Amino acid sequence: MARIAGIDLPPNKRAVISLQYIYGIGNKSAQDIIAAAGIDPTTRTKDLTEEQARKIREIIEASYKVEGDLRREVTMNIKRLMDLGCYRGLRHRKGLPVRGQRTHTNARTRKGPKRGIVRAKPAAPAR
C-alpha cells in the first residue's frame, strides 16, 4: 500500500483516483502529477513500483501544498480576514454566507438549524 503525504492510498483504485484522497489534490492535479512522473494513468496503486511512488512523492512535495500545511494556510487566511474586520471577515465571524448569497431564505448550512419562535405558555385557569 502506497503512503504519500501521510495518507494511505487505496490499493485497488487507479493511481489518478487514489491521489485525490490527499487533501489539496483534485482531478486535474492528480492527472498532472501522474503525467509528470511518467506513469500510465490506468496503473493501479498496488502496481506502482517503489521508484514510481518515490517520484510521485517528490513531485507533490516540490510543487503542491497539501494536507496539514494547506489546512493551516486556509485557516490562517480566514483568521486574517476576521482580524482585519473587513466585510468577509465579519461574515465568517457571524457564521453567515461570505460570497453574497441571499439569507432571507436558504443559507441553512452556514446558519445552522432553524430556531423556532418561543411562544408564551397559555395561562393556567384560575381556581
UniProtKB/Swiss-Prot annotation:
One of its GO terms (molecular function) is structural constituent of ribosome. SUPFAM superfamilies: S13-like H2TH domain. Residues 96-118 have a biased composition (Basic residues). Disulfide bonds: none annotated. GO terms for cellular component: cytosol; small ribosomal subunit. Part of the 30S ribosomal subunit. Forms a loose heterodimer with protein S19. Forms two bridges to the 50S subunit in the 70S ribosome. The keyword tRNA-binding applies. Residues 96-127 are annotated as: Disordered. The keyword Ligase does not apply. NCBIfam families: uS13_bact (TIGR03631). Pfam families: Ribosomal_S13. Belongs to the universal ribosomal protein uS13 family. Located at the top of the head of the 30S subunit, it contacts several helices of the 16S rRNA. In the 70S ribosome it contacts the 23S rRNA (bridge B1a) and protein L5 of the 50S subunit (bridge B1b), connecting the 2 subunits; these bridges are implicated in subunit movement. Contacts the tRNAs in the A and P-sites. This is Small ribosomal subunit protein uS13. PANTHER family: 30S RIBOSOMAL PROTEIN S13/40S RIBOSOMAL PROTEIN S18 (PTHR10871), SMALL RIBOSOMAL SUBUNIT PROTEIN US13M (PTHR10871:SF1). Keywords: Ribonucleoprotein, Ribosomal protein, RNA-binding, rRNA-binding, tRNA-binding. GO terms for biological process: translation.
